[in-house]
C-alpha cells in the first residue's frame, strides 16, 4: 500500500503506516483516529481487497480524548431520547452542532463520532442539514471512499433528497430559532440562502471524475447507489430492511445493534429537478463508455460492482431508450443463440453473485420484457427442471421468471416442476422451500392450475403418512417436524432466545399451505392433537410458531359447507385450549389466539360460552393485564358479565353474518335438512295455488257485477 502524502501525515503516523504496510490496508483508521481519502492518488492498490482507486488514506486530525468523551455522551443521550419535549431535544442538537462546528470532517471519519454525526443528520433541521452538507463540499470524493464517513454520507444524501423536494414544491421553511441564533453569521446566512439543489449539483461535479472507479469500491459503491436512486427519482428504501439496496448486510446488522433507525424520509421517492436527468445520463455514460462486452460482463459478476450495475440497468431507460448498458452485456432481442453469451448466462445461473444479478434484472422494471423472454427462450426454457435443482443459484431465477413471464410460459414451468416438486424440496438441508411457495403463488395466478396434483406433491413431501381423504386422530406430528422442525427449534428454550430467520421462513411457508387449501388446516389440527399439551402451549407462546396456531383457527365458508367430520375435529381441537384461556389471554402472543377463537367458535355457542366463562372466573387478573384487557374488550365480556342476553344477541348476529357472507340474508345460505326442504316446497306450492285461485275469483266477480263502494270500516 502506498504511503499517505504530506509531511504532517508522515511525521504523525510514520510508525503506524510502516506497520500497516505489512498487516492491514486500513490500519491507519484503526484506533479511533480517522482518516480522509486523498483525492490525487493515481498509483494502483497492491491489496486484493481494494480496487485500483484514486484514493489512499489521508489524515484529517485527531479527536482528543476529552472531545471523544463529550461526543460519545452526546450520542448516548440522543439514542436514549429522554428529553421532556421536542424543543428540549432540538436545543440539545443545536448545542452539539455548535460544539462540533469546524470539526465535522474529523468527527465524521472517526469510528465513534461518526455514529453521532449520523444521528445528528437524521435529527437536524433543514437549515442545520444545509450547514452540514456545506461543510462537506470539496471533500465528498474522500468521504465517499471512507469506511465510516460513507455511512454518514448515505444518510445525508437521503435527507438532502427530501429537502430538494421541499424546495421544488415551495415547502422549505427556515427554522425561526436557528435563523435568529445565526442571524449575524454571514456564512450561515449564505448557506441558508443557497438551494439544496445547487449544493447537490456541486457534489456531483466533484464526484464526476471518479464514477468509473467508485462502482468497484467497497464503500463508495454504496454512496453511488443512493446517488443513482436520487437523480433518477426512484424510491429510497429503508437502510435496515433485509432486502434493501442501500446498505451492505454488515451495515444493516450494525445499524440495528447501535439502534440507529431511519426517519420518515426513507421508504419513498422524491420529486427531482430536471437538471438531475442530465446528471443521470452523465453517470451512466461515465460508467459505460470505457467498457466493452468483456469488461461489462466482468462487472456483472463482481461482488461490489454488480449491485450498482443492476441499478444502472434499472434506470438507464429514463435517459437512453437504446439501453446501451444492457446491450453491452447481452445481445439484441433479435440475435440468435451465441456461444459466448450462452457461456456467460450459464455462469450467471451457476454463480452466487451472477444469479443475484440475473434475478434482480428480471424482477425490476428496467429491462424490457422482450429482453428477458429472449434469454429465457434461448438459454433456460429447455432445462427448467435442471435449474430448479440448483438450490443456491438457478432456483431463484426460476422463481423470478414465474413472476414476470407470460401465462403460457408460466404454465410450461409449472408443467415441468409440479410433478417433481416433492423431489426438489429438501427437508434436511432446508432447500427450495421458497420454491414451493412460489409455485403455489403461480398456480393461484393461473386460476389454480394443476392444483390437485400440487397439493398431492406437497403432502407427499411433508406428510407422506397422512390420509387426506380420510383424516384420523392417530395422525402423527410429521407435518410440524418436516416443515417447522420443532425438535431443533428455539421452542421451549428458557434462555429467551429470539426466533430465528429460518423459523420465520418455515412458519410463513406452513401458513401459505393453510391458505392454499383447507386440508392443510385440518392436518395442522391433528398435528396439534398429537402434540403433548405442554408443547402446544409453548407454540402458542412462541413469537413465530404462535402465528401457525393463529392461522389454523379458520372455519370453512358457509358457501362450501362444513362436513360433519370436520365439525367434530374442530370441536376436538377447541378442547385443547380448555383450562388455558386465562394464560393465553394474558400473553402477548397467546392473546391473538384467543381473539381468533371468537370467529373460530362460530356455530358452537357452547364452546364460546365456555371460553368466556373461563375469562370471567379470572376477571380481575385478566383486566389487570395489558393484553388481557384487549381480549376482554374484543370478546365483549362486559356484556357477558352484566347483560348476557345482549351478548347472546352478538353471538346470533355472528352466525347470521357467517351465512350471509356471500351476499344473501339470514338463513338463505344455510344448508337445510331434507324435511325442511320438503316442507318449504309444500308451502310454496300451496301459496301458489291460493294466489291463483284468488286471481281467478277476482276476475269472475269483476265480469258479473259492479264493484260495490265500501263504506265505514269496510272502505
UniProtKB/Swiss-Prot annotation:
Pumilio repeats lie at residues 99-134, 135-170, 206-243, 291-326, 340-377, 379-415, 531-568, 575-613. GO terms for biological process: endonucleolytic cleavage in 5'-ETS of tricistronic rRNA transcript (SSU-rRNA, 5.8S rRNA, LSU-rRNA); endonucleolytic cleavage in ITS1 to separate SSU-rRNA from 5.8S rRNA and LSU-rRNA from tricistronic rRNA transcript (SSU-rRNA, 5.8S rRNA, LSU-rRNA); endonucleolytic cleavage to generate mature 5'-end of SSU-rRNA from (SSU-rRNA, 5.8S rRNA, LSU-rRNA); ribosomal small subunit export from nucleus. Residues 706-715 have a biased composition (Basic residues). PROSITE patterns: PUM (PS50302). The keyword Ion transport does not apply. GO terms for cellular component: 90S preribosome; nucleolus; preribosome, small subunit precursor; small-subunit processome. It is found in: Nucleus, Nucleolus. Pfam families: PUF_NOP9. It comes from the Eukaryota. Keywords: Nucleus, Repeat, Ribosome biogenesis, rRNA processing. The keyword Nucleus applies. Residues 1-52, 688-715 are annotated as: Disordered. SMART domains: Pumilio. Residues 13-24, 688-698 have a biased composition (Basic and acidic residues). InterPro entries: ARM-like, ARM-type_fold, NOP9, Pumilio_RNA-bd_rpt. Its main location: nucleus. One of its GO terms (molecular function) is RNA binding. Disulfide bonds: none annotated. PANTHER family: NUCLEOLAR PROTEIN 9. RNA-binding nucleolar protein required for pre-rRNA processing. Involved in production of 18S rRNA and assembly of small ribosomal subunit. Belongs to the NOP9 family. This is Nucleolar protein 9. The gene is NOP9.
